[in-house]
Curated annotation (Swiss-Prot):
Binding locations of Zn(2+): C410, C413, C428, C434
Biological processes annotated in GO: DNA repair; DNA replication
Enzyme Commission no: 6.5.1.2
Species in which this protein is naturally found: Baumannia cicadellinicola subsp. Homalodisca coagulata
Active-site residues, as the UniProt record annotates them: K116 (n6-amp-lysine intermediate)
Gene Ontology MF terms in the entry: DNA binding; DNA ligase (NAD+) activity; metal ion binding
Coiled coil: none
Classification of source organism: Bacteria, Pseudomonadati, Pseudomonadota, Gammaproteobacteria, Candidatus Palibaumannia
Family from the record: Belongs to the NAD-dependent DNA ligase family. LigA subfamily.
Record InterPro entries: BRCT_dom, BRCT_dom_sf, DisA/LigA_HHH, DNA_ligase, DNA_ligase_AS, DNA_ligase_CS, DNAligase_adenylation, DNAligase_N
Protein name: DNA ligase
Length: 671
């Protein structure tokens, strides 16, 4: 169990970091398929060991936090994801669960089945039939305002066709996609212009939709299909999902013709079989079908779980397979020193993407496959998205193949490695002396869920470490303008913003700090438990095994990891320096006398100049505030930035206390 728990936490930390790079920084360091493979692995492990599932796991959250370059949109009805299944048996189990919940016995349920588009989920808000706002899914609760870009998509009506039944307000949900023809045209143009080419149509659609300049989006030939509704203000609502889709068509909204009303499980399986056959002829990428209980009243009865509805599920299409060649095996060093083998492949095109890498995850996998460099292998996309080496085609093996030699020294720093036979891993023993481990540790330290140093991306950290400007987290807080402006793509303005962000990060929560310093097996949830119990770093550093194991989710192994961390003189020195007056990290707490916001219902309006909306919300939640999306008599406080809207007017009418941005920062004590 120990090894499983450690492995699960490693997967979570890696996925959180990749989320931060991909969604918050627009700087992915792995392909989508590598990311999705890891997510699928984590879901499976949490299914097998449900006691190890935590509320802060990436499997319990959707997508990403909205970026600062777009205005934030709060989804009043969350945009949830879907659970996935991969075989008929799993679907029959789903059908049985639904019938049992509805007390249907052996009677047939009716379903509406649609395509599962491989694109970007968006929300379109229409008021009296006029498009007034469009937003991305984001993390399911807060998305990005992409209204101007959505207006450039020809298939999306700016005004619904009036049939006398248009609701006062309706939120249409659907998927923005890029067709295969549009994708080829985009990459051919990019090749001629020597500009960035996209790996697959989904990435191209995402990048196109999130352009700051809508005129660029307009050239990308995006398409849209709607599949559902969020908020709807109308007395007349269709009784079934299929009727809702038909109503969308009447209003002029694009709805896929590949949808089917199914009575009972067999008709659903027949539709799945049909889609499997026509998939290659669609002209755009899909990765399965979506199966929804058709009756809306039954959907309401079934409700939701943490991140998905109970009344719908995605049945993924089978993995595509191709033959390719192992050109080399490289070794990557992670934050904890674990060395992971990665197969470099002769690029092969599978299901809309070029695949050139496949993680082998452990050296035991190389042994299991009997893999040699130069071998021909079968590679498939598990779940239609994750690159996986299935087996070696031994009959095609030539005399030119060579064995995979396990590293005796770290491929990055040259230090000796040690083997953990129990966990079947090879580990670099150098710690932060190894530049690879140092880089990964620092990237974790500055990440959004940790110290949240906005603008301190992976590329900047790589440069700072390579130039030996920083050697530990303390050095981040000693950076000056001269050191930063000498870096690539760092001008005066960007440097000033980064230095401001570093200064701002000194005010954090104790829980974030504990998560940031990288104690083995201490994720966000356990860090929060430790922070709540000990209140301050000095108390935690003096803790013993007895007090640690009294805390929720802290067993002997995790407690030992905490003790070992604080018995390390190097770690102690770094923490003491970070908390010293010279660096000045301070912990916010709901127990501080500066607790102006605790327990208050707060609404934001307008744009903040110094903090992003997301950062401000995180700070207030840490101080015990409750963030609301709309103004009502129950609101205690409105925080107003620039370019305020109707919320400010309504707050004045209701005589709600209003504070401007400067006063907000003054109360927080960060400016």
């Amino acid at each position: 169990m120990k090894q499983i728990e450690q492995y699960i936490e490693q997967l979570r930390q890696q996925l959180r970091y990749w989320n931060f790079l991909y969604y918050a920084k627009d700087a992915p360091e792995v392909s989508d398929v590598e990311y999705d493979w890891l997510m699928m692995k984590l879901r499976e492990l949490e299914r097998q060991w449900p006691d190890l599932k935590t509320a802060d796991s990436p499997t319990q959250h959707i997508g990403y936090k909205a970026q600062s370059k777009f205005r934030k949109v709060i989804h009043e009805v969350p945009m949830l994801s879907l659970d996935h299944i991969f075989n008929d048996t799993s679907f029959l189990a789903f059908d049985r669960r639904i019938r049992n919940r509805l007390q249907y016995g052996n009677n047939y349920l009716t379903y509406c089945c649609e395509l599962k588009f491989d694109g970007i989920a968006v929300s379109l808000l229409y008021k009296h039939g006029k498009l007034i706002r469009a937003a991305t899914r984001g993390d399911g609760h807060i998305g990005e305002d992409v209204t101007d870009n959505i207006r450039t998509i020809c298939s999306i009506p700016l005004q619904l066709k009036d049939d006398g039944h248009i609701p006062r307000l309706i939120e249409i949900r659907g998927e923005v996609i890029m067709s295969e023809d549009a994708f080829r045209h985009l990459n051919e143009t990019a090749k001629k212009n020597k500009s960035k080419r996209f790996a697959n149509p989904r990435n191209a659609a995402a990048g196109s939709l999130r352009q700051v300049d809508p005129s660029i989006t307009a050239t990308r030939l995006l398409s849209f299909f709607c599949y559902g509704v969020g908020r709807i203000d109308s007395k007349k609502i269709p009784a079934a999902h299929l009727e809702l889709l038909q109503q969308f068509k009447i209003w002029g909204l694009p709805v896929s013709n590949y949808r089917r009303y199914c009575v009972g499980h067999q008709e659903v399986l027949d539709f799945y079989s049909y889609v499997s056959k026509v998939r290659s002829k669609l002209g755009f990428n899909i990765d399965g079908i979506v199966i929804k209980v058709n009756a809306l009243v039954q959907q309401q009865q079934l409700g939701f779980v943490a991140r998905a509805p109970r009344w719908a599920i995605a049945y993924k299409l089978p993995a595509n397979e191709q033959l390719t060649e192992i050109q080399n095996i490289d070794f990557q060093v992670g934050r904890t020193g674990i060395i992971t083998p990665v197969a470099r492949l002769k690029p092969v095109y599978i299901s809309g993407a070029y695949i050139s890498n496949a993680s082998l995850h452990s050296f035991a996998e190389i042994k299991r496959l009997g893999l040699r460099i130069g071998d021909t292998v079968v590679i498939r996309l598990a779940g239609n998205i994750i690159p996986q080496i299935v087996n070696v085609v031994v009959s095609k093996r030539s005399i030119k193949t060579s064995p995979v030699l396990y590293p005796l020294y770290c491929p990055v720093c040259g230090s000796k490695v040690k083997q953990n036979n129990k966990e079947k891993t090879i580990i670099c023993t150098a710690g932060m002396i190894c530049s690879a481990q140092l880089k990964e540790a620092l990237k974790h330290f500055v990440s959004r869920r940790a110290m949240n140093i906005y603008g301190m991306g992976g590329k900047i950290i790589d440069q700072l470490v390579d130039l030996k400007i920083i050697q530990n987290p303390v050095d981040l807080f000693r950076l000056n303008q001269d050191q930063l402006t000498c870096l690539k793509n760092m001008g005066q303005k960007k440097t000033k913003k980064l230095l401001d962000a570093i200064e701002y990060a000194k005010k954090t929560t104790f829980a974030r700090f504990l998560y940031a310093i990288g104690i083995r097996e201490i994720g966000e949830t356990k860090a929060a438990y430790l922070a709540d119990y000990y209140k301050h770093i000095d108390a935690l550093m003096a803790a013993d095994i007895e007090s640690l194991t009294k805390i929720q989710d802290i067993g002997i192994i995790v407690a030992t990891n905490v003790l070992n961390f604080f018995h390390n003189k190097h770690n102690i020195a770094i923490i003491e320096e970070l908390c010293s007056p010279k660096i000045g990290i301070k912990f916010l707490s709901t127990l501080e006398k500066n607790n102006y916001f605790s327990g208050k219902n707060i609404v934001f309006t307008g744009t903040l100049a110094f903090l992003s909306r997301e950062e401000a919300i995180d700070m207030l939640i840490a101080l015990g505030a409750r963030i609301r999306s709309s103004v009502s008599s129950k609101i205690d406080l409105l925080i107003a930035g620039k370019n305020t809207g109707f919320k400010l007017t309504k707050a004045k009418q209701l005589q709600i206390k209003i504070i401007e941005e400067a006063e907000f920062y003054q109360i927080l004590g960060i400016r």
